[in-house]
Amino acid sequence: MYVERWLKAPMLKADGVLARRTKGTPQGGPVSPLIANVFLHYGFDVWIAREFPGVLFERFADDVVVHCVTERQARQVREAIGHRLASIGLELHPDKTRIVYCKDSNRPLTYDQVSFTFCGYTFRPRKAYNKTEEKAYTSFLPAAGPGKLTEMRRKVSSWRIDRRTTSNLRDLAGPVNQVVRGWLSYFTAFYPTAVIPVCRHLDTWIMRWARKKYKRLERSRRRTHEWLQGVRLIAPGLFAHWRLRYAL
């Protein structure tokens, strides 16, 4: 009964008039992502597992990564997926649908597309180091994507930490850590050094706060920098991002 109500819920127009809908699910409705996921499970997941049993894939909502061995296979699978989606009333996104070459030291050929972003991570050729053989090489690795890094920096800036001069450092850290711990938990699973610029950006705001709060630091960036280094040394767990090893 509740599912039926969700599906038949009218659409509120800009002029305040309720319009009756005849298809689809309400945009932003609680049932919409659930129904979409069930639909794609049978419309895509079950189909590709049956038609291409040797091809691995990952799907999150309507974003999919399909792993192929050769370019020829990739083109065949892409064409088949296009036909399948058309048969169930969907289509491939013309800009986001790409064949990407996973370039590394063992796959050195040159292709136009050598990176993609999935679930906030950007996968591309990156420098790596073999500790056993003590040599550098290129691997195809994920790291927090540029878009997500920019989003995190903007979020940090929006907090305007420097205005909270009536708070002490521990009170300042509380709400900040609630958000930053989530970022670190997800985005440091692979290539954690990618998030260090965000950590330094947060440190910059902490130092701005310190210069406004303490008169002895007000006109000295050097002393503020030394102050922050001292706090990190005394209380390395005060801010969640300080658990990463990086220079200020």
Residue ranges and their predicted role:
Residues 1-248:
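Non-catalytic terminal/accessory segments
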